[in-house]
Amino acid sequence: MFLALGLVLAAAGDEQGVVPERGQLLLHPVPDARFAFAGPVGARIAANLDQWLLCAPRANPGMLEMFRLRDRQPAPQLVPWAGEFAGKYLVSAVLALRQIDHTGLRSHLSNFVAQLLTTQAEDGYLGPFPRSDRLLKHWDLWGHYHLMLGLLTWHQHTGDSAALNTCRRMADLICRTYLDGPRRVYDAGSHEMNMAIIHSLGWLYRLTGEPKYLRLMREIEKDWERAGDYLRTGLAGVEFYATPRPRWESLHDLQGLVELWRITGQAQYRQAFQHHWRSILRWDRHPSGGFSTGEQAVGSPYASGPIETCCTVAWLALSVDMLRLTGEALAADELELATLNAALGAQHPSGRWWTYNTPMNGVREASAHSIVFQARAGTPELNCCAVNGPRALGLLSDWAVMTDGRGLVINWLGPGQFSLRLPDGTPVQLRSDTAYPLSGHIRWTIQLPRGPAQFPIRFRIPGWSAPARVRLNQGEERIGSPGRYLEWLRLWHSGDTVELELELALRIRAGDREASGQVCLYRGPILLAYDQRHNSFDEPDLPALDLSRLAEAKVSFPTNPGPEADLLAPWLLVAMPAQGGRSVRLCDFASAGVAGTRYRSWLPALHLPPPPPIQRLPPDGAVVGPGKTTFRWTTRTNASLSSYRLLIWPLTEDAGPVVQLNNLTQPWVSLDECAKRSLQPGQWYRWQVIAQGPYGQVASVEPALRFRYDPTARSVVEEQTWELGRGAVIVEAPLRGDPKPVWGTLQRATGYTNAPGPDGAPASAVQLDGPEQMLVYALTGELGRDYSVGVWVRLLATPEGRLGQVFSAWAGPMDDPLRITIQDRRLFARLESGQAYSTAGVPVKVGRWYHVAAVKAGTNLTLYVDGQACQSIPVPEWVLTRSEACALGGNPRYPGNEFLAVQLARFTLAARAWSAEEVRERASAFAPEPGTGSSSRSR
């Protein structure tokens, strides 16, 4: 059906170094393998070779020339990461050489590497910056990291000792700069970027055994604690988006955890890495398989910010490591999803360019346009994504077919021919005849040039599929479980065939938050999208899909086979019934927008199932002890949900759940001792939530969280009030002389006294003196779209030269869902979500009582003083926050001085937007207390 490629040369396996690996990987690349990928992916690989890899250095000669000009005048004005371009290009090109044994590419790369090596300074420096700046600033260590990766990959593929020696000289200079002296890698700044050098240092240490490389890795590990803190947060179960450095570059630091595991065998590194990978998958992997929103993790797969190509490539590299580390089929599922959708969606089918941003909805723009600020004379097409995107295709040779040390592990289900060797050196020829992912029928034929051989082959059964039939030689049949490998151990003969039948039924993922009322639609692993090019109506007129008629959708395959195939044609079209008897034609995401037309993959729909819950507590890997343990998951904004079910299974068994709680109406439940009687001490368990609604049910996002039951341990999850009070109250505290709430949880009170309130009654308010005193409450309800806060305030003094917080829920830089601030004797309502938003200031006086409220209602934030609206400002409809606490009189997490000398009374925080009338009522009298009624629940 598609253009097939000829013979290709492929990956060497794991290169054997001089350092024995104490931490073992479960899967490895097949040594000396040859791959020939066919089908649509093979066509994209060929286009990438012809239109980019062979011509990029000639069209952008500054890729190498910048290294020669580093000490010339005038000093080149480069972007801080310019040193990465040659390294990223080299990694991508060598990986492509593994796939296409192209004489021209091999000769081209030999010359490229030879020229690159001549630009290394006598002291070992290999970067584009002047002598005064070497390794000390910019992203210079980051550039050296990518150059080392490229040269080590070239050395692994060719055995070029000069490339390895160049890496050693680079590493030696880095060690001279940052070992045994006052300087630390931390001092270079741009921490998540420059500290990624730990990854390439680990590879180089395993190859050479040079002790100082490991010593520097250990020093970087210490510096992590002041930067990304990847090890400690991973062990503590902190979600990746809530770590100090959630930018995408940190994923390459996480690869350093795998190197530390391989070198030391200490389980903490493996545990931390796995936690972060799982956390990213649950909270920040978009339905296209792409990672990041605005170049970092934000804790929502529904956010609409840019999905950068470099971020997705880093996610692919991280997922290859996860697959090798754990052998879990889930990691291979993720690699397939991201490759077929986000990665191929980022590449134009012509092979001429890659995007910077491949959004779920929007247009495809060449990175050379979107981030043109990176271009310079001599490098008109170079930017981070242009040189990095091709790596997504090259990585296929790392995971398509692997070995577990016994036999073969087949992850790639598409067409192609593969020349492989078993661990004992036995040659195996494998041919895959299929139109997958367009067809669910896959047929493998095995050839054994040396005669019959006994070994296992493991076939991946995708997690999205139904139980699948696997048939040997059109006879013996087995059933493969979704999300697992089916292993077949036998004496194989030349001509043996194995056939896999996958059901490519349409499936749905409902959206939440920003994507509420919308769905993503898949056919097998392929994400579908509306494209102007295939419909006579434009995006504003896009009708809602009628999901009750999903079975009536019609699939067609318009692409013509052969060498004259139209590369701009979609792989498939799906005519989907829509509202009002209309029909919407959907194409594969990889082809959507390739002609410059607008596209959408979050699609409006009728009769939606609930969105999949995302588990929150207990954190992954927790120890659950005696007493009550709260299980919590994301709240919903989708009206199609009616109830939840909680299921708990033993981690290593296929038996049914040992705990099942039905008809739950809140996104949390407390498991008491009675329910825990089914749990065995020391046993590991996984738990899952099923959201149920009138139009179907859906399981929580994979991977499921895990916990170990230990009746002798103290549970890591403190019991809190997760339920909202009347009026969606999160916290309500009268503050009559003490901070105890009538609803919610007081986490800590760092000093206070009682004081007269607005009516003059004694002990009807609390007083904070300013230097260190504040009241901190648990933020157990989600602040997302609509919420309000109100409190009576009397300033005792105004902060001079700084701000003071009446109320703040600050969680980190540019992450505060709401704050009421005093600055320069003025009162402000503010919000930080990626950027700062602030009302104008309202003058306030010391010694006077004010009722202050801030209300966020969708896209508006309004500041009220004494019941009157002072100003409304536009803000994001949905706020993405990591906040888990709020404070009165200070900032709950900021170590600096934002304290306020103030008297406070009647504090309320609610997870809904108050009306103007409700605010006036709260401000009108200091008499019956609003919102409390006769009920109360607090800690």
Regions found by a protein language model. Name each.
Residues 692-712:
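Extracellular fibronectin type III
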Residues 13-85, 103-127:
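Low-complexity, Ser/Thr/Pro/Gly-enriched N-terminal "stalk/linker" regions
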Residues 679-695:
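Beta-strand-rich modules
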Residues 71, 75-81, 96-230:
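Extended ligand-binding groove/face enriched in aromatic
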Residues 713-939:
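Extracellular glycan-associated modules
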Residues 636-652:
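Solvent-exposed loop/turn segments flanking beta-strands in beta-repeat/beta-sandwich domains
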Residues 273, 333-341, 346-448, 481, ...:
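C-terminal beta-rich recognition modules with glycine/proline-rich loops and embedded aromatic residues
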Residues 79-98, 139-155, 190-206, 245-262, ...:
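Well-ordered alpha-helical segments within folded domains of soluble proteins
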